[in-house]
Design a protein with these regions (language model features):
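AAA+ P-loop NTPase catalytic core and its hallmark functional loops
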Residues: 1-178, 184
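C-terminal alpha-helical "lid" subdomain
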Residues: 188-200
Length: 200
């Protein structure tokens, strides 16, 4: 409903809870092209909006993924948005609020195509992440992704490994949940295992 009303989404939760899969599926359901943008600590405004480049003997603007998405009416998927520094993200404020514009320094101000939406994902308590500032977070409708239950995990294991006996399915499920509890209590590092590692 939020996307239909022109809002942007922030999918937040533990790692491997399907945030990116949901974001990509939403773009598919709405029938819009998707731009996957992986955020990192060295990201700056030009890597999002675009930068000058030298081509055929002259300086030209090379659009970044946010600029291209905004012009095309696509869905921009901001993967792990809380990996980037808040200073780099400030350039997104006017695109994400009621103004729906992007200022391109030295060029023009563009208005986002009507269908343009942004879906950000973020992990909590993950190495290298930081808190989003309130100014940015307030521009999203936040959806907290539910943690994986034992029943969900066993269903996934059945789908991925149909030849696995129910006995081993349950044992793998219980082992994974035990490791997860130990990670949460600090007895094990969170690098010990995640859902992707289990299914691989």
């Amino acid at each position: 409903a939020a996307l239909l009303c022109g809002k942007n989404l922030l999918l937040a939760g533990e790692k491997a809870t399907g945030k990116n899969v949901l974001a990509e599926n939403l773009a598919t359901v709405f029938g819009h092209p998707a731009w996957d943008i992986s955020f990192h600590v060295n990201m700056d405004a030009s890597s999002l909006i675009g930068t000058d480049t030298f081509r055929n003997g002259k300086v030209e603007f090379r659009p970044g993924p946010v600029y291209s998405c905004a012009c095309s009416g696509g869905f921009g998927i901001f993967d792990e948005i809380n990996m980037a520094r808040n200073e780099a993200l400030a350039v997104l404020h006017s695109a994400l609020d009621f103004r729906r514009v992007i200022d391109v320094p030295g060029y023009e101000r563009i208005t986002l195509a009507d269908d343009t939406r942004f879906i950000a994902t973020m992990n909590y308590n993950y190495a290298g992440t930081r808190e989003l500032n309130e100014a940015l977070a307030s521009r999203f409708v936040v959806i907290r992704m539910p943690a994986l239950t034992l029943e969900d995990l066993q269903r996934l294991l059945r789908e991925q490994f149909p030849d696995l006996s129910s006995k081993y399915n349950k044992q793998f499920g219980l082992l994974f949940m035990d490791i997860q509890k130990k990670c949460e209590s600090g007895e094990l590092t969170s690098k010990a295992m995640d859902l992707r590692g289990l299914l691989d």
